[in-house]
Amino acid sequence: MKKWLWFPIGILALIVIVGIVFFASLTSGKVIGAMLYVDEGVVQVDSGNGWVAGQDGMELSINDKVRTLEGKATIVIFEGEMTRLEPNTEVSIKELSLESATISQNSGSTWNRLTKLSGVAEYNVETPTTVATVRGTGFGMVISGQQNDLLVGEGTVSFGAKGTAGEPISEGWKGTIASPLVKTQLNQEEKNWINGQMSNDIESLKKLRLDIINRHGFALGVIKTTFGLTDADIEQGLKDIDDGKTDEDELAKQSPIQIDDLDRVIAITKEIKKLLGTAS
């Protein structure tokens, strides 16, 4: 039997419970409004005082700007929704609330994953001339000169020029706005790009999940020392859950305490399994 499965409530629940019972004063369970992941290369942030190097895991605020130059980055909104920046892309956080979050994309290409994990009611991506509005989907936005392309990988996105009602663009289709809006089916290269972004979504969600677990770092250290666990054991335990070998709901049910961080970890795990195709 794997070491991490020695515990009747599983590592996910145990980490959180020990943290909340013994170290409650150190673990607030606060949800971060916006956070930056530096995925690759140089990423810069401007919070109003000029461009500086962005740091992996740093918090972002409304009106902050992010640009990638030759790098890549992911902005995580309310620990659930994600906007991934390809190289040579610049965005800013225009609106940040659970009622509505808006990313303003000034240049380049983004991939946007709406998981509904955060509770954000409406998510918008604006360019200088267009706006895309969604309530749960995955789509790309590409700015090339005066042309804006919306590539829909999942669900349906309302897309149109600013000041218009917008038109629905469905999964597998592309909306192009130069003037007027043109709908075409995605070509194979565009489909491959979307598939790659979906794979990246899984890795970003795994990183987010581990960040939430590591908030209870002191408790995690106690658990590892007491039971002889290594980081590799914990990673393998999470992988077993993701691969459908262990049921995260059964682990959660055995927890005598239900708190937000545990709920978030379970919800993120379900989204990972959905993208992997291992959800029951």
Where are these regions (language model features)?
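Flexible, surface-exposed loop/linker segments and immediately adjacent secondary-structure boundaries
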Residues: G19-S61, K65-E70, I77-K174, A178-T230, ...
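N-terminal Sec-pathway targeting helices
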Residues: M1-I20
